[in-house]
Amino acid sequence: MGQTLTRRDVLRTGAASAGATLLLGRSLSEATAAAEQQVGSFRYCLNTALLRGYRLGILEQVELAGGAGYDGIEPWIADVQKYAASGGSLPDLKRRIADRGLVVESAIGFAPWIVEDAGERAKGLEQARREMELVSQIGGKRIAAPPAGAVEGPAIPLSAVAERYRALLEAGAAIGVVAQLEVWGFAKNVSRVSEAAYAAIEAGHPDACLLLDVYHLYKGGSGYQGLRQLSRQAVRVMHMNDYPAIPRERIEDKDRVLPGEGVAPLSEVLSTLRANGCATALSIEIFNEGYWKKYDAKTLTALGLERMRRAVAGLR
């Protein structure tokens, strides 16, 4: 059975990993890479969506994530852009993230790389390149690639989705950032794991992978049994949350709750990822106004981590 070995554990103990002994003093990037190779392991990440209601800047988000004890952070591109536009230094932001013991596990962007119109798609691909460059400059190696721009409208053939995803992966490979094909359960396109898996396989690119979300698996009707078919390389980041007993046809993004406060089969999801051998960053993603009214930012940040750890600790 796999274990939950975080990057912090690696740095602190010099634990054996992936067939090699990790020694204290090795670089943060080396320790992170080793943690990512731990079969059936989990790391803990703050998707800054959890804090959006507080309207904090990226530096405040980093401080909260580091102070709470997360292993990584998943910022929104818009927040990084706002920081840079106001005169902030990206190299300095990269250092601050590392100084707080964090890695940039992923980033949230909405480039319309998938759309049908060729001209708009070219613009979307160029936007994605700019955003991936930004991610690279702050030390990140992954970015979300949701079906932005194709939420409504006609269904796009999966062969075309695969072709467009490959183009996105090739753009990312030149930069050193992997685009993760994200499932949006409410969208007309790429709303199910099976659709995303087909496109990722058909893309025929070694970096192809999926970005999944507990809520979106339910919303899109994917279910959870299909996760057993995914390889250990398929899911490098998983958006963690829970949801109440609302029919999937009516449930919305804002209804997501903290792990353990809903009815999602979290043990099944996490056990499957572990059995598959995935080394996955669990990234808490919730947009619940009720929490923003009930808790201050520091408390909610800590709760997100505590609830994810509790979910993993409950696995057999």
Can you name each region flagged by the protein language model?
Residues 14-25, 36-39, 62, 96-100, ...:
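Active-site acidic/histidine proton-transfer and metal-coordination neighborhood
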Residues 74, 106-108, 144, 180, ...:
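Conserved beta-strand positions in the central sheet of alpha/beta enzyme cores
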Residues 74-94, 152:
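Glycine-rich, proline-tolerant flexible connector loops at the mouths of alpha/beta enzymes
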Residues 2-45, 50-68, 190-212, 216-316:
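Histidine-acidic metal/acid-base catalytic patches
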Residues 79-81, 112-117, 151-155, 220, ...:
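A short acidic, helix-capping loop that chelates divalent metal ions and anchors anionic groups
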Residues 83-90, 118-121, 294:
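Metal-dependent catalytic neighborhoods of phosphoester/phosphodiester hydrolases
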Residues 50-52, 77-79, 110-111, 147-151, ...:
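Active-site-proximal loop/turn and secondary-structure-junction residues that shape catalytic pockets
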Residues 68-77, 105-111:
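Short, conserved active-site loops that position catalytic residues or coordinate cofactors/metal ions
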